[in-house]
Amino acid sequence: MKYRIAFLLLFLNSFCSVVLSQDDDVDIDEWQVMKVEAAKDPFANGSQFTINFANYTKEEWCYPLPGAKVNSPFGGARHHSGTDLKTFGGDTIRAAFPGEVILSGPYYAYGYCVILRHANGLETLYSHQSRNLVKVGQWLHAGDPVGLEGQTGRATGIHLHFETRVNGRAFDSARIFDHENHALIRQIFVVTKQKNGTLKFTAEQVE
């Protein structure tokens, strides 16, 4: 009987390991508002602002983890707050847009984490890094190194947990990045603050 129990426990442990390996974040299941320096309100002049990504040059943006594949997308049943990007491990993570470092260091379940605040009204977050390569207050150009892909915090595999945010609230990065082709989507991106405080994201495609 004890051998059957031992076999069952071994099977369950193996099964759980397989399930976790398919979705590397075991922690960041809800949209989280992080305590960082207050941002200039992008809605200070009205309930809407736009970003014309169609006019961005190659110097103004960079895919955050070149060569990566999506291991776990945004949202889903557990409300995953970011997009998990994965390479073979240890690769350099890069700034998606020009911006200022407003957080750099260990941050609870995120592990070694960096947040950049961009002039276009967005923030980007990079977490589970093995090492941060930037300091708070530093200004980065698009493509500058942010850190090294890792497994710090509560994560079961080496990867980058990447978030795009407005006013500290996460939205799907696939709205602005074509993850399959590692490209910025050429569009006029519109963010509207609704009367109940929620944010609505729409896009006008540009030929």
Predicted regions located by residue number:
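Residue-level recognition of beta-strand microenvironments
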Residues: 73, 104-105, 132, 149-152
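Polar/charged, compositionally biased leader and regulatory segments
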Residues: 2-4, 8, 13-76, 181-207
